[in-house]
A protein has these predicted regions:
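Alpha-helical transmembrane segments in inner-membrane proteins
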Residues: 1-333
Length: 333
């Protein structure tokens, strides 16, 4: 894809993202106009005065910020996972990242008094990292890990961890009551403290992932071809997996295991960019937050004055896209 077309796509995606941000700040039990949102943001920045609209916007800022971060993290992690496994149906959970984070959170709830939010960031991240290392250890052989081995190892580890989660949740009603709200995934009830907690991991993972576009393009040609181009396949795969783990684990820790964003966004963007992972990563980083914020807004509109959890909306949006992707792959084959 040419630079001119890419620039136009990025500009259009940024415009859509800005619209999603305004909608996220304006829509809810109390509706605000874009002008009220702008005035309230200015008041929030300058610290001058306070009105009811200002308080409403201030209460929606944390969920909007976390929507931006989680959407970008999940979408970019999805691109990296699809590139590493050379599987267009892969998502960030294919290496057991979501299951590892969830198992760690359930353990914290059951044995260390963790709640549904807050300190889960520091519990979920180690759980996800340990799970990825375990998956790579199981998938590695004399010739290193292959995409098929990674997928199989990730599937096995995920199944074991989900069995552990179900065993704890079914035998501990108190844990189940906490876990069921976190497990669906939602942006509601979040605070800026959680955004600050995941910010370092998010920035490191995002920077490393955006820099991996060239390596992912090389790996798409096969490991031997990638090696002939000066890329070390083993090192590239480990670095990419760690970057995706930081992104997915930080997002999962903050907002829960929201599904389908990491699968749906790369597919939507790829239809415009083609297979070039460099543009795919950049555009996914912008489109992912827009999709997640619009899903959150839709959840607020569908059940006012209450709301439908964001994870439910993304599943409703992502499932048809997954079916279309599978049918498209069969048609191409």
């Amino acid at each position: 894809m040419g630079a001119g077309r890419g620039t136009v796509l990025v500009a259009g995606s940024v415009a859509v993202l800005l619209a999603a941000v305004v909608a996220s700040l304006a829509v809810g039990a109390h509706q605000l106009s874009p002008a009220e949102v702008a005035a309230s943001l200015w008041t929030e920045i300058t610290g001058t005065g306070s009105t009811y609209a200002d308080d409403v916007v201030a209460s929606r800022i944390p969920r909007t910020v976390l929507g931006l971060m989680a959407g970008a993290a999940l979408a970019v992690a999805g691109v990296v996972m699809q590139g590493l496994t050379r599987n267009p149906l892969a998502d960030p959970g294919i290496l057991g990242i979501n299951a590892g984070a969830a198992a760690a959170v359930v353990t914290g709830m059951a044995f260390f008094g963790a709640g549904a939010t807050g300190a889960n960031v520091w519990i979920a991240l180690p759980g996800a990292l340990v799970t990825v290392l375990l998956v790579y250890g199981l998938a590695s052989g004399r010739r290193g890990s292959t995409p098929v081995r990674l997928v199989l190892a990730g599937t096995v580890v995920t199944a074991v961890l989900m069995s552990y989660i179900q065993a704890i949740a079914l035998t501990r009603p108190d844990v189940f009551n906490l876990y069921r709200f976190w497990a669906v995934g939602s942006l509601s009830g979040r605070t800026m403290e959680q955004a600050w907690d995941i910010l370092p991991f998010f920035l490191v993972g995002l920077a490393a992932s955006l820099a991996a576009g060239r390596f992912l393009n090389a790996l798409a040609l096969g490991e031997e071809a990638a090696a002939s181009l000066g890329v070390r396949p083993g090192t590239a795969k480990i670095a990419g997996a760690l970057a995706a783990t930081l992104l997915c684990a930080s997002a999962t820790a903050a907002v829960g295991p929201i599904g389908f964003v990491g699968l749906a966004v790369p597919h939507m963007v790829r239809s415009f960019t083609g297979p070039d992972n460099r543009w795919l990563l950049v555009l996914s980083a912008v489109t992912g937050p827009a999709l997640l914020l619009f899903a959150d807004v839709a959840g607020r509109l569908l059940a006012r004055p209450g709301e439908v959890l964001t994870g439910v909306i993304t599943a409703l949006l992502g499932a048809p896209l997954l079916i279309l992707a599978v049918r498209r792959m069969r048609a191409v084959a």
